[in-house]
Amino acid sequence: MRSAKQYTSAQFMNTARISGIAFSPDEEKILYTSDASGIRNVYEVCLSDGRHRQLTYSLSEDIQSISYLLNDRCILFSKDLGNLENSILCVLEPTGKEIVITPGAEVQTLVHGWSLDQRSFFASTNERDQRLYDLYKFEALTFKRRLIYKATEKFYFCSISPDEKYVLFAKSDRKADSDIFLYDVSREEMKCLTAHDGDVLNCLAVFNGDATAVYYITNEGSDFRYVKRLDLASGESTCVEKASGDVAWTFFSPDGRRRISFCDDPYTTLRSMKIHDEETGSVFTLSGFDDRSLNCAVVSRSGRHVAFYAEGDRSPGNLFVHDFETRFTTQLTESLNRDVDRQDLVESQIVSFHSFDGLEIPCLLWRPHGTTETGRAPALVWVHGGPGGRLTKGYKGRIQYFVNHGYVVLGVNYRGSYGFGKTFYNADHRKQGREPLWDCVAAKNYLASLGYVDTARVVIIGASFGGYMALAAAAFCENEFAAAVDICGPSNLVSLAKKLPKYWDKKRFYDKIGDPQKDEELLRSISPLFHADKIKRPVMILQGANDPRCPREQSDEMVAAIRRHGGPVEYLVYEDEAHGFRKRKNAIHAYEAILNFLDANLKSNVIQVQSNPMEATVSA
């Protein structure tokens, strides 16, 4: 097998992360967001010559591009104040002046799209009540706004009809149960369109071009999600699209001529884009993307172009544009750091194993270049966040970094992961800290079957809820893993459930994990904090000081409890971070520190990347 050049954390993390798509009114430029500067800022790219231009220059707070304004003379964007997941809307004028158009430091603002005449846009904000989102119409010239819907319940905006007479909302009763509602703006009346018995997911509804029908995602009578069409005149609904796995979502082009769908393949974990011609009934996909997932498509106002992102294991997310007239597809960005040779990256393998009870668990396996069949490599069991998330194929610089340094990585889609059917998704209901964790323990048996993994040197690592799983493994399966790494994961599910952000849907969380009032004994029994006396193997915890999802106290208390019982723990706190690592300098430092921790505990030849004290605070 070929060997690979070894790279630093900085070289992997210097790959840009890009998102957001907005065409200029003349369709000659595209607005997008990139962290090429080290933090998210707004950029634009010219379609004719491929030139890029940075438009905002934030040094501390994330900025997300939204749209051009006023014939592309101004830019609409959102700013995350303090990186605490509270966003305000701002306008960037040609002079460089920024104007704030939504109030409040503890407010979330969500932009939904433009009116048919492009003179106004729609946005929801929770400034009146942090638990609820009111819908407004903003004038593009004056930024004056008019209330469209005042929320009395937790409804989520889906779509507004072209004539602005009706709005589609979704409402969840439980984690696996939701409905679509039609709101009559003039009558101020809300009507349920998808009344049903039992648990059925109905979500992501859109109007068709002339607003005579509603298309929405459902799993009614099916293990996977599909598209239904509801005729508003007759009330009849019919299935119009199914796939081998979930249809993730669907939407119409501004002219109504095309419908775009994204479909998840549970066998490859790749996401494909299907383009439906509403006039001819034909369906086609873009060629050249068989090994990559397509995401986040936007069709231009004229309907001539569709822009989208494509991402693969060895190809970070890049922006593409397809011309429906010429049938040419053009790549507009190159995100991978030029210092990294794509051939040195590792393509993941789709594998699976049978867990303790026989349930098949889908996984992704990264095997380092140069690993021999008789080798004894250390390994990481990589646990994704959620609960209800998943790990898919796609560029993951942090995983490639560890693989590049000799670690086999097995990404486990434990029971409860999204994308593998309704039955699999609901299999972790009120079972956190038990069955999903046991799936991760069973992953060691699969690693042993490979022949080239030293199962005495297997570490469990995860972020967010994956971090909780790592701590749970250290506490409840204390002899299974050589060490555990927790990145911003909760340790006390009782206090976490009591202090959820107000804008979260508590019912969905309680349904999946447990209600702190009714299920406190259950939550205590699966909270690592109350079982720290069992932790004997090395643990590393990394935490953002301003984390709104997993507050710092969750990690502070866990570290104190482990030390109180004599357990080994290393602790890093990042003073200018929230949930995860948004700033590149922090990501570089964090993953260097993790590698140092792994090497110190698993390898005889320690790579001294940076000093790694038992506890440290990392400042901006």
Model region roles, listed by residue range:
Residues T8-Y43:
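Beta-strand-rich domains and repeat architectures in extracellular enzymes and scaffolds
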Residues I30-S37, T56, I75-N83, S115-L116, ...:
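Beta-strand C-termini and the immediately following turn/loop, strongest in propeller blades
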Residues I39-Y43, L84-C90, Q130-Y136, A176-F181, ...:
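Structural motif
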Residues M1-I18, V45-Q64, G82, V91-Q108, ...:
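Multi-bladed beta-propeller domains
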Residues H305-F328, S491:
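Structured, non-catalytic alpha/beta "coupling" segments that mediate domain-domain communication
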Residues S335-A456, A463-S464, A497-K506:
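Cap/lid segment of the alpha/beta-hydrolase catalytic domain
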Residues Y414-A620:
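Active-site-proximal cap/loop segments of hydrolase catalytic domains
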Residues I21-K29, I66-C74, H112-S120, C158-Y166, ...:
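Blade-terminus and WD-like Trp-Asp/Gly-His loop motifs, strongest in beta-propeller folds
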